[in-house]
Curated annotation (Swiss-Prot):
Mod. after translation: Contains mostly 4-hydroxyproline. Prolines at the third position of the tripeptide repeating unit (G-X-P) are 4-hydroxylated in some or all of the chains.
Official protein name in the record: Collagen alpha-1(II) chain
Natural source organism: Mammut americanum (American mastodon)
NAD recorded as keyword: no
Function text: Type II collagen is specific for cartilaginous tissues. It is essential for the normal embryonic development of the skeleton, for linear growth and for the ability of cartilage to resist compressive forces.
Length: 669
């Protein structure tokens, strides 16, 4: 919710004890300048007027200029004007003003490098006036410049330290404070460390080092504005009062302000007020009194309000600026915001797992339905994994086809072998008993060409001669090609079954079996998938069929199931067209399932699994293969019966009536 409103303004603090009266009228002008700084308004014009007015006013203006410099570049230009006025001045107070102006120039240098060059010129003028001012300006330039310039300025600061130890310590403290105000990175911390080392070379380095450490801690406290104000206050106090105790007191006050970081703005105002008070005290030459007041402030620094009251007390009696009240208590939490809008829809889910293959018996019906459907149905079937897709599976397949761009999901384990279909109707009667096999083969080829699916299946099942089987395999291949062209799904399914039977009969010739299996696979693929995919599928199917033939001894039902499953898997893989290796793995898994269903040796299944692993199948594929082996535990169905013997032919029609015989010879008389 929205944060609560600001609490009511606290009551104004008690009036501080009246401070010592300032000696000169310039002090009165300084008081006015301090009031302007507290008001934080008319900064540039007031700063210029103060610079023209007096050195103490210039010191106060330095604090105001620091905040103003953070505010805008125009204030930096005003600071440069103040620096010029300081150069025009030529008294000890003017030297102090030059030091304050140097701090302002440091802010200006932070604003622009050209201003840094001007600050160097001002430093030269100040050097003509006083070496201490030059050291302060050099330290300011070091704070403003980069690390290398800081090192050079550090050397200059060392020379300044040789000139005046106390002034050098003050300059080092100012430099550390300025660096903290600049809020540079670790380089600034290193510069501060170098300044601390230079201060260590100085006599009264201990207090200065403590002040520098306090300034660094304040900077680390992330109160950048407060740190800048504290830095200006420290510089003004150090330049005005040569006593290290006063600097230490100022540092303690700054530390207290940093501790009370809750109200950064209030702390900055208090620091500015303290700086104005220190400047007024310096102008009044009552350094001891200022130190005592600062010590009292440090002692009473427990509460920020107390510190503000102390600062007010330190200020001239004429100013009597009321301190801002303590911040109000935290407002109650606002009511909860309205509920957010519904998020955007999630991304499409992964494609679902493939459905298990339906029973083989249903396959014929499904194929017929596919044939009844147009080529679109064939395309859907191509997407489907199983040759015998259920209606729901077909719908899922359509969805998958839409999302074909995604990687193909792993093929699900093949379903258990279906029961064999019912025996076909009896085949046509053979012409002659002797040549029955050959005649049957020829008839089968003719029937297949004629697309008499039932008769072809019966004849193929009836065929049993090995030599005839080879011929039949060739004929079946031709028939399969014709059927594929005709796109008769039922005939294709029958041809696949016939080819499986022929392969079982012709197990003796491995090559013939492989050819037959390949032809069957091609036919099944053509029936199940689009004709275009069949060409690509043929090679993979042939390899898969060869692997299957090698893996398991051919059993009629097992071979048929293996051929159908392999063809379906190969077709799906071809449709995916992503990884031929995956297709090979799927074919291997199908072969393993077929072997298990046929109750073949377990070793063969293990070998098939090993082959799949060797084929770089994914781990998921391997798991699927294991699951398929587990699921394939169902008993294999027995092969279908051969068709009944054909009915005897109808009796022939009765012959025509014979011609009348010749008249008999004449009888004897």
């Amino acid at each position: 919710g929205e944060p609560g409103g600001v609490g009511p303004i606290g009551p104004p603090g008690e009036r501080g004890a009246p401070g010592n009266r300032x000696x000169x009228x310039x002090x009165x002008x300084x008081x006015x300048x301090x009031x302007x700084x507290x008001x934080x308004x008319x900064x540039x014009x007031x700063x210029x007027x103060x610079x023209x007015x007096x050195x103490x006013x210039x010191x106060x203006x330095x604090x105001x200029x620091x905040x103003x410099x953070x505010x805008x570049x125009x204030x930096x230009x005003x600071x440069x004007x103040x620096x010029x006025x300081x150069x025009x001045x030529x008294x000890x107070x003017x030297x102090x003003x030059x030091x304050x102006x140097x701090x302002x120039x440091x802010x200006x240098x932070x604003x622009x490098x050209x201003x840094x060059x001007x600050x160097x010129x001002x430093x030269x003028x100040x050097x003509x006036x006083x070496x201490x001012x030059x050291x302060x300006x050099x330290x300011x330039x070091x704070x403003x410049x980069x690390x290398x310039x800081x090192x050079x300025x550090x050397x200059x600061x060392x020379x300044x330290x040789x000139x005046x130890x106390x002034x050098x310590x003050x300059x080092x403290x100012x430099x550390x404070x300025x660096x903290x105000x600049x809020x540079x990175x670790x380089x600034x911390x290193x510069x501060x460390x170098x300044x601390x080392x230079x201060x260590x070379x100085x006599x009264x380095x201990x207090x200065x080092x403590x002040x520098x450490x306090x300034x660094x801690x304040x900077x680390x406290x992330x109160x950048x504005x407060x740190x800048x104000x504290x830095x200006x206050x420290x510089x003004x106090x150090x330049x005005x009062x040569x006593x290290x105790x006063x600097x230490x007191x100022x540092x303690x006050x700054x530390x207290x302000x940093x501790x009370x970081x809750x109200x950064x703005x209030x702390x900055x105002x208090x620091x500015x007020x303290x700086x104005x008070x220190x400047x007024x005290x310096x102008x009044x030459x009552x350094x001891x009194x200022x130190x005592x007041x600062x010590x009292x402030x440090x002692x009473x620094x427990x509460x920020x309000x107390x510190x503000x009251x102390x600062x007010x007390x330190x200020x001239x009696x004429x100013x009597x600026x009321x301190x801002x009240g303590a911040p109000g208590e935290r407002g109650e939490t606002g009511p909860p915001g309205p509920a957010g809008f519904a998020g955007p829809p999630g991304a499409d889910g992964q494609p679902g797992a493939k459905x298990x293959x339906x029973x083989x018996x249903x396959x014929x019906x499904x194929x017929x339905x596919x044939x009844x459907x147009x080529x679109x149905x064939x395309x859907x079937x191509x997407x489907x994994x199983x040759x015998x897709x259920x209606x729901x599976x077909x719908x899922x397949x359509x969805x998958x086809x839409x999302x074909x761009x995604x990687x193909x999901x792993x093929v699900g384990p093949p379903g258990a072998n279906g029961n064999p279909g019912p025996a076909g109707p009896p085949g046509p009667a053979g012409k002659x008993x002797x040549x029955x096999x050959x005649x049957x083969x020829x008839x089968x080829x003719x029937x297949x060409x004629x697309x008499x699916x039932x008769x072809x299946x019966x004849x193929x099942x009836x065929x049993x001669x090995x030599x005839x089987x080879x011929x039949x395999x060739x004929x079946x291949x031709x028939x399969x090609x014709x059927x594929x062209x005709x796109x008769x799904x039922x005939x294709x399914x029958x041809x696949x079954x016939x080819x499986x039977x022929x392969x079982x009969x012709x197990x003796x010739x491995x090559x013939x079996x492989x050819x037959x299996x390949x032809x069957x696979x091609x036919x099944x693929x053509x029936x199940x998938x689009x004709x275009x995919x069949x060409x690509x599928x043929x090679x993979x199917x042939x390899x898969x069929x060869x692997x299957x033939x090698x893996x398991x001894x051919x059993x009629x039902x097992x071979x048929x199931x293996x051929x159908x499953x392999x063809x379906x898997x190969x077709x799906x893989x071809x449709x995916x067209x992503x990884x031929x290796x995956x297709x090979x793995x799927x074919x291997x898994x199908x072969x393993x399932x077929x072997x298990x269903x046929x109750x073949x040796x377990x070793x063969x299944x293990x070998x098939x699994x090993x082959x799949x692993x060797x084929x770089x199948x994914x781990x998921x594929x391997x798991x699927x293969x294991x699951x398929x082996x587990x699921x394939x535990x169902x008993x294999x169905x027995x092969x279908g019966f051969t068709g009944l013997q054909g009915l005897p032919g109808p009796p022939g029609t009765s012959g025509d009536q014979g011609a009348s015989g010749p008249s008999g010879p004449a009888g004897p008389r």
